[in-house]
């Protein structure tokens, strides 16, 4: 969790460029050891920077399609990738050192968001299926249960329109970046009607969003949102919502983004952003941490 009024350096460093990660990157994940994972959609490989390294030191020759959009890693090191190619499927890699895979499920929709909760349940956002579904990973069944959405695009509280990133907190409440409805929806456990917690239809409108693609929470349940078509990252605290980085509009300079897609924090509070149309991953340092140049700086509990 972050202190109130935390700030990030407005000029980012480029953590990975197009030569490394290919064009139009989307997926990103950082595990509890500060290992960073992304997908090069141009060659179907998973790239891994282990344990806060600045150099790619593991590459999985995964033979993924150019439509592999989302990646996550569980606490026991298993890697899950949503590959929305000709066969739309969720693939499990046994660990970071193996190309051995298992198909967990095949689906009928592109998947732009994956999440595993504390009960080892996998959640998937079905982009053109306008739903979020889930599957218990300890089960051999490939059946998926619907958690949110009706299967048709719409603006009602029980509907979604091209959902992207998802997050499930310790209460098993689901947050959805409801992309084409320009809002963040909260579906409490067991509820099919969502509550708009950020965006254009929020009852307490404090921030407008344009095609949000990712949402995560910190330990205080404050939201961090990829506001994709406004080319900025939004954060919240006890004072409400605010732009935290890339607040000057679309561009390619170190303080700008061009259609950001995914975000993740390392345990030092530094913010990593997949900057899709600039074909790079940008690192915005938490202002008090000096980008980890001093290794004894405070570590932050980023995720719930």
Region locations from a protein language model:
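Beta-rich, blade/repeat-based domains predominating
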Residues: 21-33, 64-79, 107-122, 156-173, ...
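Blade/loop signatures of beta-propeller domains
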Residues: 1-11, 140
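Structural signal for beta-propeller blades
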Residues: 44-47, 87-91, 130-133, 182-185, ...
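A short beta-strand motif characteristic of beta-propeller blades
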Residues: 13-19, 55-62, 99-105, 145-156, ...
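Short loop/turn segments that connect beta-strands within beta-propeller blades
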Residues: 50-54, 93-98, 136-140, 188-192, ...
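Blade-level signature of beta-propeller repeat domains, shared across WD40, Kelch, NHL, RCC1
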Residues: 258-304
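Residue position within the beta-strands of beta-propeller blades
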Residues: 37-39, 80-83, 123-126, 175-177, ...
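Solenoidal tandem-repeat scaffolds enriched in leucines and small polar residues
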Residues: 99-193
